[in-house]
């Protein structure tokens, strides 16, 4: 059974007429509209060129969190402020630590040891002996692990149970 839909009625429109002798406008329905709206740009207190006013000015607390010279107000990467070599982080200052040295295994994941500006891997330092091999792998290959998917890339799982809901074919 086919249904036909009546055409959509036209949207109501208003026509404004400007009368030069007064500041009153009238609509098609005869309702007077009074008033004038004047829009002005923001007045600047300092003497700046027009090109300087159009540029984005970042606050001092905004960081370049990707190392590419681009500042952003949204954080898309975890930023770790660079520290001096001997300086410790607040996480490793706990009293239950076995070692008093600052470069422990817990600091490896700080982001500093992962990549340099040239995007090449950097050797990481930690406090255990490798027997002089310096991460050579001792001749064995590690099984390749699947990379972790972050929350933005993960596809949500939906219930495919539709029989009891009345939906579906």
Swiss-Prot record:
It is found in: Nucleus. Residues 93-110 have a biased composition (Acidic residues). Residues 138-147 have a biased composition (Basic residues). Residues 1-169 are annotated as: Disordered. One of its GO terms (cellular component) is nucleus. Keywords: Nucleus. Pfam families: PPI_Ypi1. Residues 50-60, 128-137, 154-169 have a biased composition (Basic and acidic residues). Residues 1-12 have a biased composition (Pro residues). One of its GO terms (molecular function) is protein serine/threonine phosphatase inhibitor activity. Residues 14-28 have a biased composition (Polar residues). Regulator of type 1 phosphatases which maintains protein phosphatase activity under strict control. PANTHER family: E3 UBIQUITIN-PROTEIN LIGASE PPP1R11 (PTHR20835:SF0), E3 UBIQUITIN-PROTEIN LIGASE PPP1R11-RELATED (PTHR20835). Belongs to the YPI1 family. This is Type 1 phosphatases regulator YPI1.
């Amino acid at each position: 059974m086919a249904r036909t839909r009546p055409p959509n009625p036209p949207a109501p429109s208003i026509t404004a007429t400007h009368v030069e002798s007064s500041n009153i406008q009238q609509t098609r329905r005869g309702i007077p509209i009074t008033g004038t709206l004047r829009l002005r740009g923001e007045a600047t207190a300092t003497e700046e060129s027009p090109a300087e006013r159009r540029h984005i000015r970042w606050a001092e607390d905004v960081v370049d969190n990707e190392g590419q010279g681009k500042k952003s107000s949204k954080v898309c990467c975890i930023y770790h402020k660079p520290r001096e070599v001997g300086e410790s982080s607040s996480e490793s200052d706990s009293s239950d630590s076995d070692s008093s040295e600052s470069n422990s295994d817990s600091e490896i994941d700080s982001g500093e040891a992962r990549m340099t500006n040239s995007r090449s891997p950097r050797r990481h330092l930690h406090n255990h002996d490798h027997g002089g091999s310096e991460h050579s792998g001792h001749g064995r290959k590690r099984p390749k692990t699947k990379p972790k998917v972050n929350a933005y890339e993960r596809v949500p799982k939906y219930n495919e149970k539709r029989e009891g809901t009345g939906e579906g074919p």
